[in-house]
Regions:
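Conserved GTPase G-domain substructure that encodes guanine base recognition and part of the catalytic core
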Residues: 1-555
Length: 555
């Protein structure tokens, strides 16, 4: 049933107002109403779904458009979305009320977790809409807030969940970047926001990117030069200017009552009305253009997201494997040098003790951290941390598991998914010093090979063991390089956090801006830079660590 069906004498926006909730306290000159929304029972991690109205009786024949709205914290994204809803519902300058879809005032008072979800609003078409279609708005949390890079990475994971789920979003019409008009050059944070989002999309989405400029006036927005300079892939006009739409929502909730005293107030009202009219024209232009854009499937984007996540998991494990390989090589060299150094003593006494440095596996408690993990019970290694899957019965869905074979891509034994568990600890490695004797070493290898072992044979066995590990590392590196090359083929932009120079730029930006929590964010970025440097060498076919060069040469 259409609860908004209005009588001929009643405008559609008035009918919606009658069903809406007045927001209190009233913060501005006009009362503001939250439109009636129904929360949908769709379970996708990190996402919430709301609908306005009911689906058309025409079903799938009813035209529908989907937009995603993105922006850095403070770019004016929430106000812009509220401007859209007032336009769609037909609110006029002279009306004595306004609507809100996104209530920034309320969300700021709530815990971070309440404002951290990707929110999907489905506005079902009704007679009285100013647009001829149903509209889905994907509202993302603001990028670049005080919670830092880790929080921003969570947002991309939430979008990934939304695009990959059968109940989520499978196609898109416009990816809308909200940017402030006055930014002559993009800050490192702004550029990071653009590149982070672009990196999750397939190349076929480039034509659907639109720039929404906020706090605009009648002039050419300076931010367009910054967008051109930063290389954001988006459609451009004949003169090379990015396709954009200008908005100034300063008049959205402004006083529209006629001034009956000072002429100065009269001028101010005319000024506000001018901005309102400008906003209405911009909205009309934007939604007319939206109705002409070719809808794109998110199939390629899902492929980008899947391959990038698999690469991240592999890189984490690759670093561990290479370091373990290097530690094993050092252990072999140290053992050989000690045997040579004490050769005379060993000949007369096989129980002669010497110290050797090595890495030992240890369990690190993660209980209480809120993180899940995937550990291989057979190999006693951590295959994926943090993992988004808490239930062991669902571990086949972990990023470390090959979905075709059901076997782990990361652990040494390539074990079946059902021997992988969510546990209260992760496996790590610590440097220890152990006492060794040649007799013990020989006995261990004799037990393994069934052959009598000489000191020379012992050294060959140690070297052979290292060669096996080195070969495994090489295979991992080749797999990662293959994945990197595939991402270059299909992704719209590389992941900004995969480039050491880019991360260094972010670090310098954090230091200069010195916003609250900057030291913690810099610390996080330094760790990412180390990973990025590691991966850059892998991609070039170089030895990932400088120590590896020297150890390989000297052995």
């Amino acid at each position: 049933m259409n609860i908004f069906k209005s009588e001929s004498s009643k405008r559609f926006s008035d009918a919606v107002k009658a069903k809406s909730t007045l927001l209190e306290p009233q913060l501005g000159p006009l009362p503001v109403y939250r439109i009636p929304l129904k929360e949908e029972k769709i379970k996708i991690n990190g996402c919430r779904f709301f609908s306005f109205g009911e689906p058309s009786k025409f079903g799938s024949k009813q035209q529908s458009r989907t937009i995603m709205v993105l922006g850095a914290t403070g770019a004016g994204k929430s106000t812009l979305i509220n401007g859209m809803i007032n336009y769609i519902l037909g609110v006029k300058w002279g009306d004595t009320y306004r609507f809100k879809l996104v209530d920034e005032g309320q969300t700021k008072c709530q815990a971070h977790s309440q404002t951290s979800e990707v929110t999907v609003y489905k506005l079902f078409y009704r007679d009285g809409f100013e647009v001829p279609f149903s509209l889905t708005i994907i509202d993302t949390p603001g990028f670049g807030d005080t919670r830092g890079i880790e929080r921003d990475r969570e947002i991309t994971v939430q979008l990934q969940n939304l695009f990959a789920s059968k109940d989520g979003v499978s196609e898109i019409d416009a990816v809308c970047f909200v940017a402030q008009a006055a930014l002559a050059r993009l800050t490192s944070t702004q550029r990071y926001v653009f590149d982070s989002i672009l990196s999750i999309f397939g190349k076929d989405i480039a034509e659907n990117i639109r720039i929404l400029v906020t706090f605009a006036d009648g002039q050419k927005p300076p931010v367009l030069e910054g967008i051109i300079e930063s290389g954001v892939p988006c459609p451009k006009s004949k003169d090379g200017i990015p396709v954009h739409f200008k908005f100034n929502n300063s008049a959205l909730f402004a006083d529209n009552k006629s001034a009956d005293t000072q002429s100065g107030d009269d001028d101010e009202e005319n000024f506000d009305q001018m901005f309102w009219n400008m906003g209405t024209k911009s909205m009309k232009r934007f939604f007319t253009a939206l109705n002409q854009i070719e809808t794109k499937s998110l199939t390629l984007t899902n492929e980008v997201l899947r391959e990038r996540k698999q690469l991240e998991v592999s890189v984490e494990n690759l670093q561990v494997q290479v370091r373990l390989g290097l530690a094993k090589l050092e252990e072999i060299r140290e053992t050989r040098e000690k045997i040579k150094e004490h050769e005379a003593a060993i000949k007369t006494n096989e129980n002669f003790e010497f110290d050797v440095s090595l890495k030992k596996p240890v369990q690190v408690d993660i209980s209480g951290s809120g993180d899940y993990i995937t550990n291989c019970q057979q190999c006693q290694v951590t295959c994926h941390f943090p993992c988004g899957i808490p239930n062991d019965a669902n571990k086949r869905g972990c990023w470390a598991i090959d979905q075709n074979t059901g076997r782990c891509r990361e652990c040494k034994g390539k074990c079946n998914w059902n021997v992988h568990f969510n546990q209260r600890y992760r496996w790590d490695y610590k440097d220890v010093t152990e006492k060794r004797t040649v007799k013990e070493l020989k006995e261990n290898y004799e037990k393994a090979t069934g052959q009598k072992m000489t000191v020379e044979g012992l050294m060959r066995q140690l070297k052979g063991e290292y060669d096996i590990m080195q070969n495994e590392v090489k295979k991992l590196m080749e797999k990662s390089t293959k994945c990197l090359n595939r991402l270059k083929e299909i992704a719209l932009k590389p992941n900004p956090l995969s480039t050491p120079e880019y991360i260094e730029m972010l670090i310098e930006g954090e230091k200069q801006e010195a916003k609250p929590g900057w030291k913690k964010r810099v610390e996080s970025l330094m760790k990412m830079k180390e990973k990025a440097e590691f991966m850059a060498k892998v991609e070039k076919g170089e030895k990932p660590l400088s120590r590896q060069e020297s150890l390989d040469v000297k052995f």
